[in-house]
Each structure stands twice: as C-alpha cells, then as structure tokens.
Amino acid sequence: MWRERAARCGEAIAEQFCILRGYEILARNAREGRGELDLVALDRDTVVFVEVKFRAGPNRAGQARGGNDRGGPLAAVTGKKRDDVARAATRWLAARGATGRPVRFDVIGITWCSEESELRVQHVPNAFPGGSRHFF
C-alpha cells in the first residue's frame, strides 16, 4: 500500500514538473493492453510518453529503506520496461489514429532523501528510442 501511494505521489510531482515546462498532459496512468503509461503529454508537436520512477531513502546516495542501494530511480527502467512502455505507446497511438506523430520517451526520476528533507527530480528527455523491438 505504501508503494502504491508513493508511486501516485511521484506521478503527481512528475505531472506538475511537465506542466511547468509547458507540456500539455493528455493522459495519466493510461492502460493499453497489459501495459500502463504513467503520463502521456504533448511537447509542442511531439507526443511524449513519460515513465516515472520514485524512490525514498535516507541519504543523498539514493539508498532505499534498510540501506539497500538499488541504483536510484532511473536504474529501474530496464530493457524490459522500455519494451513494455514502447508496446503500450504503440497501442495508445494506434487507438487514437496518431501513429504518424513525432514521439519521444522521457524518464522522470524522483528521489526523496529523508535525512536531508530533500526532493530531487531528474528529467531525462529522449531517454530511450522506443525499446529494442517496438518502434513506430
């Protein structure tokens, strides 16, 4: 339950981050087949699929609870996750007749450092090219 709440909180922070940068939010937590897209946004004429990763830890190194360092939020976007997001994005675009639109995949990593009472947001635009097998 804590994990779900933290994920939703991270997604809300990422959404506000995107809005402040001029993105128009098109969808939140969009389910496409078995996949889910955290955020779908429009940055000028480009459809942006944003994968959000949230981590909470005691220190600046991004260590998780219990001192377990999992590499921070961006390290959680594995090759399989990239493929899953790309597959869901393909379905999302096809369902809306938008397969010819420019597309980008961003990752927003959010880390809460409790010892420092600091929230860090890291945005990686064009973080991956659409997965290893699924591109438009």
Predicted features along the sequence, with ranges:
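Mid-chain, well-packed structural core segment of small domains
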Residues: 69-103
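Short acidic/glycine-enriched loop/turn segments that link adjacent beta-strands
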Residues: 32-35
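Domain-level recognition of nuclease-like catalytic cores that cleave nucleotide substrates
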Residues: 94-136
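A solvent-exposed, charged loop/short amphipathic helix patch at secondary-structure junctions
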Residues: 63-67
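Conserved catalytic cores of phosphodiester-cleaving nucleases, focusing on short active-site segments
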Residues: 18, 37-62, 77, 85
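Acidic-basic catalytic patches of nuclease active cores, encompassing PD-(D/E)XK
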Residues: 1-28
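Hydrophobic residues on conserved beta-strands that form the core of alpha/beta folds
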Residues: 25-27, 49, 105
